[in-house]
Each structure stands twice: as structure tokens, then as C-alpha cells.
Amino acid sequence: MSAVVVARRLTVGYGERRVLDGVDTFLASGGSIALVGSNGSGKSTLLKTFAGLLEPLGGVVEVLGGAPREASRSIAYVSQFHRNALALPLRAIDVVRMARFDHRGRFARASVDDETAVAEAMDTMETTELSDVALRDLSGGQQQRVYVAQALARRGAVLLLDEPTSGLDAAGRAAYLRAVERERERGVAVISATHDIGEASTCDRVLLLAGRLIADGPPDVVLTPENLLATFGVGLTRVHDQLVVTEHQHEHGHENGH
């Protein structure tokens, strides 16, 4: 199976400031990767590079066989921050519909396929009843569901998610995990940045990041006390998909960035 996302000796950052060095990885259609690390470890920066929002500082990154920007129509990206949408008088359904028109111009007319994609995405994330509610009037968790629905409505080949379960309650988290499984079944490659070890454990592979690639492999192989110490700078162990502090270590410095 050919790779959909490829990174070779990839260095990412902002301007001349490196945040993450030496990433070598790949992801095929229908596969999933969790990016795990502390704040500033490079998770968000790597996702933005895969999305084509940042140019790599070194190495090679390819999405669907070319530069990420060239594949932007086939990439769905959920950011941590959505200030622009909150500043506008948009309803939840308007936000989800944006996924179908951002590459087609503001005066494009909705097709049956567009409306079907929007309706299915909102149903999947259990936001249909919120369709006509102003985004700014929704709770943080409800807003997050809407943003995930927006990404699903795009029906891209690659789904990039930055802290997708942040603010979600148990029902929202369950809806999200079901949605990801459904996307993978139809061949979508999924990469998520997360602090949720339970979420990470549902992925095929975990990349542990700390300004560099600490480990890349299946969750049961990668999430060891030794690797977690190298990643977070504190003794941790995995207990029932939670990280538990086992001992305190000296402070482990990271460069600023996400």
C-alpha cells in the first residue's frame, strides 16, 4: 500500500527557529498516527507542516505524492484555535458548510453531494440539533464537535486534527472515535496531536515527540516508561490508558513551540 503522508529527515519550525528535528515517518491510506508530547514538543507545528500551512525548514514532506499545498483540496485540518469563526455571526451549519466551499469561491452553489456531506458529518458528531445555533453561543465542547464535523464534511483523503477531543465530554469523545473509525474504513489517513493516551492507543502508531522524534511504533511498543521519560522528562507509566507519575525527575527542557 502506497504512502499518503511521507516525512524524511524533516525539520519544522517558524522562520529560523527550529521546533522539531529529524522526523522520518509515513502513513498509508486508512492508517492512523497519534502525535504525543508535552507543550512545545512540535506536535502542532508538524501538523501545520503536513497541512501545508508552514514550509519545512529542512528535509522532505509529501502528501499524496507532492507538496502539501498542492494537496490542500484533499486535506481536512482541525486547528486548536478558531478565533476567526467565533468573530463572525455564523451558525453551526454555516461553519460545517465552509468545508465544501473554501476552494470553490464564495458564490458557489451547494450541490446535493455538498448538502449530503454536511448533513452526514453533523449527524456523525451529533450536532444536527445545533444547526441553527450561533457558534459563539455554543459551549466549548459543542464548538469542538462542530469543527470536527466541518473536517468530516470536507471528505478529504487526509484528516489532520490538533487536540480533537479537547473539551469533549464522554459522549462527544465517543462520537469522535466512531467518526475516525468510519473515516479510516473509507481509506482516509488520520493524524492527530493529542495528550489523551486513551485516544492515542486507538491509533496504529504513536510518534513520541520532544523537539525530536523519540519513538515511532505501535502504542503497546512505544508507550514504555523509558520512552515516556525521554518525552516528558518525568517518570510516567501507562495504567488503563492514563499516564501516572511514578517519580519526579529533573526538569526536561523543550524549545518553545507546539
Regions found by a protein language model. Name each.
Residues R97, V112-L130:
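Conserved ABC ATPase "signature" region
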Residues T224-H258:
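ABC ATPase nucleotide-binding domains
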Residues L159-E163:
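Catalytic Walker B motif of ABC-type/P-loop ATPase nucleotide-binding domains
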Residues V36-S38:
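The feature captures the beta-strand-to-loop junction immediately N-terminal to the Walker
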Residues A51:
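Helix-to-loop junction immediately C-terminal to a conserved catalytic motif
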Residues P56-R73:
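Conserved ABC transporter NBD signature motif
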Residues C203-P219:
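H-loop (His-switch) and adjacent beta-strand-loop-beta switch element
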